[in-house]
């Protein structure tokens, strides 16, 4: 099934209704829960979190760092979903995201892999159906394409 930008955006936005950002305890929990899922299911990627390379889900749960980081990642995903209909703004946000992450020297393949991780998290908390997952993967495919183009144009490793 082929979806247009508006359909993809709408499906992604809908999938995030139960994972809102904010200052209330539940909002903080929403973001922290992503990192608990991440650290439990993708422990090899903890190397990108200096000082937390050996963290368990329990360590993440008690961490103010991951309370804040969880809000940032959820906000980024909300922004991606909400600006997807404006292709140039979407691509600009992708490039800015890449620029902010340069210092971490991330494997360029991780830009697409993130969407597998994120949709897995949404599935694990009951926030995702098959159509929404397909929408996130379509958005992720475009995110990755722009990421790789920007990395290449910046003379950085790319796939």
From Swiss-Prot:
Keywords, in A-Z order? Cytoplasm, Heme, Iron, Metal-binding, Oxygen transport, Transport
Where expressed (tissues)? Expressed mainly in a subset of neuronal cells and in head muscular tissue.
Residues of the Globin domain: 1-152
- Annotated heme binding lies at 101
Q: Where in the cell is it found?
A: Cytoplasm
Subunit structure, as described in the record: Homodimer.
What Gene3D superfamilies has UniProt attached to this entry?
Globins
Q: What is the lineage of its organism?
A: Eukaryota, Metazoa, Ecdysozoa, Nematoda, Chromadorea
Q: Say where the protein is mainly found.
A: cytoplasm
* Tagged with keyword Phosphoprotein: no
Name the domain of life this protein comes from.
Eukaryota
- Name the SUPFAM superfamilies for this protein: Globin-like
**What protein name is recorded for this chain?**
Globin-like protein
- Report the family membership: Belongs to the globin family.
Indicate yes or no for the key word Transport: yes
What organism is listed for this UniProt entry?
Caenorhabditis elegans
Q: Which InterPro entries match?
A: Globin, Globin-like_sf, Globin/Proto, Globin_nematode, Mb-like_M
The record's GO molecular-function terms, alphabetically, read: heme binding; iron ion binding; oxygen binding; oxygen carrier activity
What's any one GO cellular component for it? cytoplasm
């Amino acid at each position: 099934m082929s979806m247009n930008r508006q359909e993809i955006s709408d499906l992604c936005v809908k999938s995030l209704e139960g994972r809102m950002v904010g200052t209330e305890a539940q909002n903080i929990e929403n973001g922290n829960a992503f990192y608990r899922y991440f650290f439990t299911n993708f422990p090899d990627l903890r190397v990108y979190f200096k000082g937390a390379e050996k963290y368990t889900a329990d360590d993440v749960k008690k961490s103010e760092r991951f309370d804040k980081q969880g809000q940032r990642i959820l906000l980024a995903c909300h922004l991606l979903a909400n600006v997807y209909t404006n292709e140039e703004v979407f691509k600009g946000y992708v490039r800015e995201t890449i620029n902010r992450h340069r210092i971490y020297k991330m494997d360029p393949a991780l830009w697409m892999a993130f969407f597998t991780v994120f949709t897995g998290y949404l599935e694990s908390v009951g926030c995702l159906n098959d159509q929404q997952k397909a929408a996130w993967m379509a958005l992720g495919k475009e995110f990755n394409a722009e990421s790789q183009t920007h990395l290449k144009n910046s003379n950085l490793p790319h796939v």
